[in-house]
Amino acid sequence: EVNNIMILGGSRIGVRIATELQDEANVKLVEYNPDKAYKLTETLEKTLIISDDGRNIDSMIEEGLSNMDAFVAVTGRSETNILAAMVAKRLGVKKVIAEVENLNFINLAESMGIDTIINKKLITASNIFRFTMNTDVQAIKCLTGCDAEVLEFIAKPNSPATKGQIRELDFPHD
């Protein structure tokens, strides 16, 4: 059971997680930028907002990191997220999640014992893939070797994807 959660980073993801969980758990959100931290106090009324540097291990221990059931690192830097997640894991946090946007670091992060890796590019590609598979796809081509991945879908005749403009398709908004 997860009762105490610490989120590192007041990013969109961090705010969304805090918003979703603040009614059901004790949520602490650590944000480095003091101005941003202050603004977050206005929108996250049931979340304890802490303006501090999450890279400072002593500060994180002082804020109760070792007493957390879960830790989520979602700053804008993959390296910071990986290191903070490793510290949380070593301090005994049961569930550790890190956002890793640098695709080169994903295998490294997984090998370090981080429980869950979040990568927005892979999540988006997966959601598009899943949505498109529901529309009767005939073939898929994947091009790699650069900073982006491109999937080419060939939709079968009469599938919903062929009956109008892309903006008219019922893509999920999340």
Predicted features, each with a name:
Residues 1-174:
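Cytosolic regulatory regions of ion transport systems
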